[in-house]
Amino acid sequence: MSGLILVPLADKPAMGHKPLQWSLDLWGTGNPWFSAEDWRSFYDRGALADYSRWDGAGVDQELIYLALDSDEVVGVIALVDFDDVEEFRHLKPWVAAFVVDPARRGTGIGSQMLTALEERARNFGIQRLYLWTQDEREFYQKRGYEFLHHRDYPEISLDVLGKDLI
């Protein structure tokens, strides 16, 4: 696990199928905000994105990173400029599409991935990150994220958290 690295999906687009399936398994079939086709389009856009900079201009920038351990995909995590929850679109940018291979959960990979994404965000000059979660609030709070909001929607209940990076 010490060899864990984040690689832009654009550098290894052929490796995106496994994390896409994880995303579909968790969120993509029946989510009223983000359909299976939306997930496929998200990964397609990530495979074509410019990872050299964060433009911060309010465009729908989506940077998807594969977590690799010895050239095996063990997770996926994204930095995005928008969120699918309309009420919170004014908060930017977001940690999104964060999934660890189900067979590798509980091994510290998720913490390493989140730390690596935060470092990339800092390098882009991003000062604060946001995310939402359905049931992992404690995981994020242990890593410095502060609880901001809880919302119960007809389709989903979620917590919004934020973290200062600077």
Walk through the language-model features, giving the residues of each.
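Conserved beta-strand in the GNAT
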Residues: 62-66, 72-83, 94, 99
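Conserved N-terminal entry element of GNAT/NAT acetyltransferase domains
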Residues: 1-18, 25, 165-166
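Conserved active-site alpha-helix within GNAT-family acetyltransferase domains
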Residues: 123, 127, 134-157
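A conserved beta-turn-beta hairpin within the catalytic core of GNAT-like acetyltransferases
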Residues: 82-95, 105, 154
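Active-site rim helix/loop that mediates acceptor-substrate recognition in acyltransferases
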Residues: 23, 27-66
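Short hydrophobic/aromatic beta-strand or adjacent loop that forms the aromatic wall/cage
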Residues: 62, 156-160
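Conserved acetyl-CoA pyrophosphate-binding loop and the N-cap/start of the following alpha-helix
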Residues: 103-104, 108-116
